[in-house]
Amino acid sequence: PSSSHTVGPMKAARLFLKNAVEEQHFDAASTVMVELFGSLALTGVGHGTDKAILMGLEGETPEEVDPESVDLRFHQICRDEKINLLGNRMVSFSTANNLIFHKDEQLPHHSNGMRFSLMGHPQKTLFSQIFYSVGGGFVLEEKEMENSSCENSIRVRYPFSSASELLQHCENQSMSIADLVLTNEKTWHHEDKIQEGINSIWYVMKGC
C-alpha cells in the first residue's frame, strides 16, 4: 500500500465526517458521495484507496483498524449497499454510484485530491469538502492548501531532485538519508506529527 493512497484517504474520510458532525449536518445525512481525482483515481483501486476510504467513513483510523477485517467489511458494504458512518449512522451507499473515479480530472492544488459530499433528501448537498493527500499519510483541507504557500514554494534545507544530489548532501553533511529527509520534512511538520505519520504507514503496511 501507499501512504498517500491509503493512510491519507482513510484519515480524510473520517475527518470529513467529524467536521460534518461539528457543523451539525451529520444527523440529516441519507448518503455520502466520494469523488477521487488525479493519481487517486488512476491508481487508487490497485493501492486499496477505495477500501481505505470506506473504512475511514466507518470511523476507522490507520492506527486502530484491523487489516484482516478490511476485505470482509468492504465486500459487505458492496453487497448490502449500506455503510455505517462513524460506526453510528447507517445510510445507503453504492460503490458503483457513490464512489466516483475522475480519471481525466485533477484538482488544482495536488494530484491526490478527494471531494466528499454529505447528501440529504432529496439529493440535497448538506456539506462538502475537498481534501488532499500530500504524502506521508498527511492530509490537508482545501482551505489549508490555499492559505499556505504550499510545499513547492517553500525551500527545504537540503533540496534535491535526484539520488545523486541526495547522496551528495548526505556526504557533505555527514548525515544518513533518513536524518536528512527528516530535516527536510520538518519544513512543513513538527517532528511528533512526522513520527505519527511514519507509525501509521508502518502499521498499515505491516498488516498487509
Where are these regions (language model features)?
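Feature of Fe-S/electron-transfer and energy-metabolism proteins
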Residues: 18-208
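Conserved phosphate/anionic-ligand binding catalytic regions in large, soluble enzymes, centered on
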Residues: 1-13
